Curated annotation (Swiss-Prot):
The chain crosses the membrane at residues 16-36, 347-367, 369-389, 396-416, 440-460, 472-492, 537-557, 863-883, 888-908, 910-930, 968-988, 998-1018. Belongs to the resistance-nodulation-cell division (RND) (TC 2.A.6) family. MdtB subfamily. GO terms for molecular function: xenobiotic transmembrane transporter activity. It comes from Salmonella paratyphi C (strain RKS4594). GO terms for cellular component: plasma membrane. It is found in: Cell inner membrane. SUPFAM superfamilies: Multidrug efflux transporter AcrB pore domain, PN1, PN2, PC1 and PC2 subdomains, Multidrug efflux transporter AcrB TolC docking domain, DN and DC subdomains, Multidrug efflux transporter AcrB transmembrane domain. It is a multi-pass membrane protein. The lineage of its organism: Bacteria, Pseudomonadati, Pseudomonadota, Gammaproteobacteria, Enterobacterales. Pfam families: ACR_tran. Keywords: Cell inner membrane, Cell membrane, Membrane, Transmembrane, Transmembrane helix, Transport. Part of a tripartite efflux system composed of MdtA, MdtB and MdtC. MdtB forms a heteromultimer with MdtC. This is Multidrug resistance protein MdtB. Its main location: membrane.
Length: 1040
C-alpha cells in the first residue's frame, strides 16, 4: 500500500498514477488501434470533396451546332432542369456533338443523381431526332477532372482501326468494370467501319441519287427477327443471309438495274474498310495511337482505383498480339504517393526536431523519453478515429498531424515541467506527480478545449472548402484530445516512476552550460519585463500598433485561393483559326508536338484532334504533356509552361494554352487556363454584341494574361437557300434536300453490321477529292416527281456565311466563358477586383449577367467568409475561456495576444512572396490557438498566486511570467519546429504545404517576442479596470 502525503489528490490523474499497469495497457490499446487503423486507411491526394457530377454525351454526326442545340441539347436541358438537387447545368453544342454537364449539390448521393438523370433522359427520348445513331450516354464523371491514368496503344504492324477494335473489346471494357472508374474514353477513336464513298458523277450519269444508294444499302443489310417453325415433333429456328459483313460484299451489292444490266455499288462508289469517323486522330509522342484516358467517379479513391487497373493490365495485354504495345504514359497516383511520402517524412522530421528541443531544455534522458512517448502515441492513436470517420491518409490530414506534433507535446511538457519543479524542491516523485498533475490539470483542460474551439468554425465552413478542411480540422482536434488524455494519464504516471532528484540534478558540462544560458535569458527577460511593467502605456501603444499593422497587412497582401501544384502533368489546348479543317489541325499539332518533345523536362506527349465530346470543335486540339519526375528536371511546372509557350509562339496560325493539372478540380468543363469568368444573356445576339467589348477590355488589364473566350462565331458555313416554290413544283421536299446533303457530307451512319463481339457501322459520303470546297455542292442531285434527277442548283442558291462553331449554355441560357491566367506579380484577388471594376465601367445592361466560375467562384466565396471565420474562431474561444475561468475579463486578456500572431504570419507570407490563400488562412487560425497558450499559462499561475499566496496582481503576474518562461519558450519552439519542415518543403506537393509552414513559423516568431511583454501589461490593465468598476458599482461587489 502506497503512503501518500496529505493534500496530494492528483485530480483526474490520480487513478492513472496509482495504477501503472492499467495505464500502460490502456495506452497499448490506443497504440494497437492506431497501428491497425493506419493499415486500413486509404491513401489519397486530398479529402474526397468532389461535387456529384454526371456528363451526358449525344453524338449526331453531320449536325450543325444550331441543329444540335435545338434538336438535342434543348430537349435534354428542359428535362434535366426539373431535377431536384441540381446545382449547375452547363452544355456545349458543336458540330455533331452535344455535351451536357450536370453538377449536383454536395449532399446529394451520386447514385441518386444517376437515377434522376436516367429518368430525365427517358422522358426526353420522344423529343429527340428519330435518326440519332445512339441514344444519349451518361457517365458519372467530371469532364474537367484530369484522367487518373493515360495509356497509349500503338502498333507498327496493324492499322489503327484493328487496334481500336481490340482495345475496345478486350481492354477498355474490363477497365471500365473496375470499382471507382467513371469513364474510359478512347481518344482517336478509329472504330472499324465500311466506308462507301460515292462518285457523284457516276451516280448522276446513271440517273441515280445518293438517296437511292442509301435505301438500297439499308434494305440489303438487316438483322431482325424471323420467327421459327413449330412442328408436331421438332421446332426449327429461321435465319437468313441478311447480313453483309465485309467491304467486298458491299462492293458487289446490286443497287439498281440499267437496261437490264445490274449496277453494283462498286461501280459508283469506292467501298473500303476504314474508320467510322475520318476526322478523329490521336498521337502519342507523334506516333499514331489509341489513347485511353481513365477517369474516376466523383468520390472514388484514386489510389485504389489505379492499383486495381495496374494489377489487371498484365493479364489484359497478354490477350493482344505481340505487335500491339500498351504504354502507361501518365499515372497521377505516382505523384500522389510521392507527395504523401514526402509529407510523412516531414512528419517524422517534425517529431525528431520536437524531441530534440525537449532534450535541449530538459537535458535529461528520462524526462525526454516521457514526451517522446506521448507524441507518437497521440499521433498514432488518431489513425484509429480516422478509420471510424472514413477519412484517408492525404496531404491535409498528414499536414494536420505534422502541425499537431508541436501541439501535442505542449501538454506533456507543461506536466513534466511542473512535476519536475516539485521534485527539485525535494518532494518524492509520486507525491510530486500527484501534486503537479493535480495543479496543472485545469490548465491542460483549458489549453485543450480553447484550442479545439479554434477549429470549430472550420467544421461549419460551407460548400467545397468546408468539406475539404473538415478532415484537417477533425484530425487535428482528435490528436489534441488524445494528447490531453495521454498528458493527464500516462505522462504523470511515467514521471512518478522515471524521474527522481538524482536524475534531474545529474548534469554534465553541456547541461551546466545550457542551464547557465537559460538562467541568463530568464534574468534578462525579468529585467526587461520589470521595465515594461513600469511603462505600461508604451507597451499598450505597441500592442495597438500591432493591431493596426495586422489590419493594414491584411488589406495589402496578395490573396489567392489554392496553391498551384506541380503534379508533373500539363493540360493544353491548341487553338487555330475558326475555319481550320481536320487535315490542317493534324498538321499543326505535328509541328507543335515536335517543339514540345524537344524540351528537356518533357517525358511524353499525347495529342488529339477531332470532335468527340471531349473536344468540341475541329479548330482545336487537346494535349497532355507528361513531365519527368521532379527530381529529374531542373524547373518547376510554371517555368516549363513558359518555355513551351515561347517555343511554340513562332508557329504561325496557332495559340497554345497550357495549365498544370491540380488535385482539386472545381470546374465542370475543360478550360484553356486556370480561371474562368462567364457572361450570360437571354439571346445569342446580345452575347455577340457584348463579348468582343468585354474581351477587349479584359485583354487590356495588366492583372490578367492569356485572356480568351469560347465564343467562336466566325466559322465558315454554306447556307443552302432553297426556293420552296420551285422545289414543290418538282415534288422535292425539304426532307429530300436535307437527306441528300446528309448522305453526301455528314459521314452518315446508314446501317449496322452485327457480330458476336461488337457492332460496326456503314458510313455513306461523297468522294470530294476531285471537287473540294463549295464546288462539291454542285454534284448534289435530287429525285423529282417524274423520277428524273434535278441538280441542287436548280432549286437552291448557295451563300457563304459565318456561323458559330459551338453554342454554350449555362442553366439553359446562352453563355460565353472567358478564360484567363494571373501573370507574375499579381494575385487572383487583384485579377478578380480588376474584372469587377471593368464590369462596372462597361455598364452592362440588366439582361446581361456575369459570374465567376470554378475555382474563381470558390475563391470569392472563401474570401467573403474568411473574416467571419476568424471572428467565429475568436468568439468560440472567448466563450470556452469565459466558461472555464468564470470571467468576462480574463478571456479578453488571453485573446489580446492574437494580433501579434497575425502580424507575424502576414509579414512572413509577404517576405516569402506567398499569397494569402486558404492554406495560409488555416495557418493563421491555428496560430490563434497556439499563441493564446502563452497567455493561459501566465494567467493561470498569476490567478493561483493571488488566491493561494495573497500576492498583489503585479507580483503575481511577474512571478508567473518568470516561472512559465521556460515551458512557454519550450512549447513555442516545439510548435515552430513542428511547422518548420512544412515551410522548408521542396518535394512533390510542397506548394500545398509551404504556406501553412510559413504562416505558422512567422506568426510564432513574432508572437513569442511580443506576448511575453504585452500579456502581463494587459492583465494588469484589466485588473485595474475591474477594480474601478467595482468601486463605481459597489452593488456588484456585494452580489459577488
Amino acid at each position: 500500500m502506497q503512503v501518500l502525503p496529505p493534500g496530494s489528490t492528483g485530480g483526474p490523474s490520480r487513478l492513472f498514477i496509482l495504477r501503472p499497469v492499467a495505464t500502460t495497457l490502456l495506452m497499448a490499446a490506443i497504440l494497437l488501434a492506431g497501428i491497425i487503423g493506419y493499415r486500413l486507411l486509404p491513401v489519397a491526394a486530398l479529402p474526397e470533396v468532389d461535387y456529384p457530377t454526371i456528363q451526358v454525351v449525344t453524338l449526331y454526326p453531320g449536325a450543325s451546332p444550331d441543329v444540335m442545340t435545338s434538336a438535342v441539347t434543348a430537349p435534354l436541358e428542359r428535362q434535366f432542369g426539373q431535377m431536384s438537387g441540381l446545382k449547375q447545368m452547363s452544355s456545349q453544342s458543336s458540330g455533331g456533338a452535344s455535351v451536357v454537364t450536370l453538377q449536383f449539390q454536395l449532399t446529394l448521393p451520386l447514385d441518386v443523381a444517376e437515377q434522376e438523370v436516367q429518368a430525365a433522359i427517358n422522358a426526353a427520348t420522344n423529343l429527340l431526332p428519330s435518326d440519332l445513331p445512339n441514344p444519349p450516354i451518361y457517365s458519372k464523371v467530371n469532364p474537367a477532372d484530369p484522367p487518373i491514368m493515360t495509356l497509349a496503344v500503338t502498333s507498327n504492324a496493324m492499322p489503327m482501326t484493328q487496334v481500336e477494335d481490340m482495345v475496345e473489346t478486350r481492354v477498355a471494357q474490363k477497365i471500365s468494370q473496375v470499382s471507382g472508374v467513371g469513364l474510359v474514353t478512347l481518344a482517336g477513336g478509329q472504330r472499324p467501319a465500311v466506308r462507301v464513298k460515292l462518285n457523284a458523277q457516276a451516280v448522276a450519269a446513271l440517273g441515280l441519287t445518293s438517296e437511292t444508294v442509301r435505301t438500297a444499302i439499308t434494305g440489303a443489310n438487316v438483322n431482325s427477327a424471323k420467327g421459327s417453325l413449330d412442328g408436331p415433333e421438332r421446332a426449327v429456328t429461321l435465319s437468313a443471309n441478311d447480313q453483309m459483313q465485309s467491304a467486298d460484299e458491299y462492293r458487289r451489292l446490286i443497287i439498281a438495274y440499267q437496261n437490264g444490266a445490274p449496277v453494283r455499288l462498286g461501280d459508283v462508289a469506292t467501298v473500303e474498310q476504314g474508320a467510322e469517323n475520318s476526322w478523329l486522330g490521336a498521337w502519342a509522342n507523334q506516333a499514331p495511337a489509341i489513347v485511353m484516358n481513365v477517369q474516376r467517379q466523383p468520390g472514388a479513391n484514386i489510389i485504389a482505383t489505379a492499383d486495381s487497373i495496374r494489377q489487371m493490365l498484365p493479364q489484359l495485354t497478354e490477350s493482344l498480339p505481340k505487335s500491339v504495345k500498351v504504354t502507361v504514359l501518365s499515372d497521377r497516383t505516382t505523384n500522389i504517393r510521392t507527395s504523401v511520402r514526402d509529407t510523412q517524412f516531414e512528419l517524422m522530421l517534425a517529431i525528431a526536431l520536437v524531441v530534440m528541443i525537449i532534450y535541449l531544455f530538459l537535458r535529461n534522458i528520462p524526462a525526454t523519453i516521457i514526451p517522446g512517448v506521448a507524441v507518437p502515441l497521440s499521433l498514432i492513436g488518431t489513425f484509429a478515429v480516422m478509420v471510424f470517420l472514413d477519412f484517408s491518409i492525404n496531404n491535409l490530414t498528414l499536414m494536420a498531424l505534422t502541425i499537431a506534433t508541436g501541439f501535442v507535446v505542449d501538454d506533456a511538457i507543461v506536466v513534466i515541467e511542473n512535476i519536475s519543479r516539485y521534485i527539485e524542491k525535494g518532494e518524492k516523485p509520486l507525491a510530486a506527480a500527484l501534486k503537479g498533475a493535480g495543479e496543472i490539470g485545469f490548465t491542460i483542460i483549458s489549453l485543450t478545449f480553447s484550442l479545439i474551439a479554434v477549429l470549430i468554425p472550420l467544421l461549419f465552413m460551407g460548400d467545397i472548402v468546408g468539406r475539404l478542411f473538415r478532415e484537417f480540422a477533425v484530425t487535428l482536434a482528435v490528436a489534441i484530445l488524445i494528447s490531453a488524455v495521454v498528458s493527464l494519464t500516462l505522462t504523470p504516471m511515467m514521471c512518478a516512476r522515471m524521474l527522481s532528484q538524482q536524475s534531474l540534478r545529474k548534469q554534465n558540462r553541456f547541461s551546466r552550460a545550457c542551464e547557465r544560458m537559460f538562467d541568463r535569458v530568464i534574468a534578462s527577460y525579468g529585467r526587461g519585463l520589470a521595465k515594461v511593467l513600469n511603462h505600461p502605456w508604451l507597451t499598450l501603444s505597441v500592442a495597438f500598433a500591432t493591431l493596426l499593422l495586422s489590419v493594414m497587412l491584411w488589406i495589402v497582401i496578395p490573396k489567392g485561393f489554392f496553391p498551384v501544384q506541380d503534379n508533373g502533368i500539363i493540360q493544353g489546348t491548341l487553338q487555330a483559326p475558326q475555319s481550320s479543317s481536320y487535315a490542317s489541325m493534324a498538321q499543326r499539332q505535328r509541328q507543335v508536338a515536335e517543339r514540345i518533345l524537344q524540351d528537356p523536362a518533357v517525358q511524353s506527349l499525347t495529342t488529339f484532334v477531332g470532335v468527340d465530346g471531349a473536344n468540341s470543335t475541329l479548330n482545336s486540339a487537346r494535349l497532355q504533356i507528361n513531365l519527368k519526375p521532379l527530381d529529374a528536371r531542373d524547373d518547376r511546372v510554371q517555368q516549363v509552361i513558359s518555355r513551351l509557350q515561347t517555343a511554340v509562339a513562332t508557329i504561325p496560325g496557332v495559340a497554345l494554352y497550357l495549365q498544370p493539372t491540380q488535385d482539386l478540380t472545381i470546374d465542370t468543363q475543360v478550360s484553356r487556363t486556370q480561371y474562368q469568368f462567364s457572361l450570360q444573356a437571354t439571346t445569342l445576339d446580345a452575347l455577340s454584341h457584348w463579348v468582343p467589348k468585354l474581351q477587349n477590355a479584359l485583354q487590356s488589364l495588366p492583372q490578367l494574361s492569356e485572356v480568351s473566350s469560347d465564343w467562336q462565331d466566325r466559322g465558315l458555313a454554306a447556307w443552302v437557300n432553297v426556293d420552296r416554290d420551285s422545289a414543290s413544283r418538282l415534288g422535292i421536299s425539304m426532307a429530300d434536300v436535307d437527306n441528300a446533303l446528309y448522305n453526301a457530307f455528314g459521314q452518315r451512319l446508314i446501317s449496322t453490321i452485327y457480330t458476336q463481339a461488337n457492332q460496326y457501322r456503314v458510313v455513306l459520303e461523297h468522294n470530294t477529292a476531285s471537287t473540294p470546297g463549295l464546288a462539291a455542292l454542285e454534284t448534289i442531285r435530287l429525285t423529282s416527281r417524274d423520277g428524273g434527277t434535278v441538280p441542287l442548283s436548280a432549286i437552291a442558291r448557295i451563300e457563304q456565311r459565318f456561323a458559330p462553331l459551338s453554342i454554350n449554355h449555362l442553366d439553359q441560357f446562352p453563355v460565353t466563358t472567358f478564360s484567363f491566367n494571373v501573370p507574375e506579380g499579381y494575385s487572383l484577388g487583384d485579377a478578380v477586383q480588376a474584372i469587377l471594376d471593368t464590369e462596372k465601367t462597361l455598364a452592362l445592361p440588366a439582361d446581361i449577367t456575369t459570374q465567376f466560375q470554378g475555382s474563381t467562384l470558390a475563391f470569392q466565396a472563401a474570401l467573403g467568409s474568411t473574416v467571419w471565420l476568424i471572428v467565429a474562431a475568436v468568439v468560440a474561444m472567448y466563450i470556452v475561456l469565459g466558461v472555464l475561468y468564470e470571467s468576462f475579463i480574463h478571456p479578453i486578456t488571453i485573446l489580446s495576444t492574437l494580433p501579434t500572431a497575425g502580424v507575424g504570419a502576414l509579414l512572413a507570407l509577404i517576405i516569402a512572396g506567398s499569397e494569402l490563400d486558404i492554406i495560409a488562412i488555416i495557418g493563421i487560425i491555428l496560430l490563434i490557438g497556439i499563441v493564446k497558450k502563452n497567455a493561459i499559462m501566465m494567467i493561470d499561475f498569476a490567478l493561483a498566486a493571488e488566491r493561494e499566496q495573497g500576492m498583489s496582481p503585479r507580483d503575481a503576474i511577474f512571478q508567473a511570467c518568470l516561472l512559465r518562461f521556460r515551458p512557454i519558450l519550450m512549447t513555442t519552439l516545439a510548435a515552430l519546429l513542428g511547422a518548420l519542415p512544412l515551410m522548408l518543403s521542396t518535394g512533390v506537393g510542397a506548394e500545398l504545404r509551404r504556406p501553412l509552414g510559413i504562416a505558422m513559423v512567422g506568426g510564432l516568431l513574432v508572437s513569442q517576442v511580443l506576448t511575453l511583454f504585452t500579456t502581463p501589461v494587459i492583465y494588469l490593465l484589466f485588473d485595474r479596470l475591474s477594480l474601478y468598476v467595482k468601486s463605481r458599482f459597489p452593488r456588484h461587489k456585494e452580489e459577488a
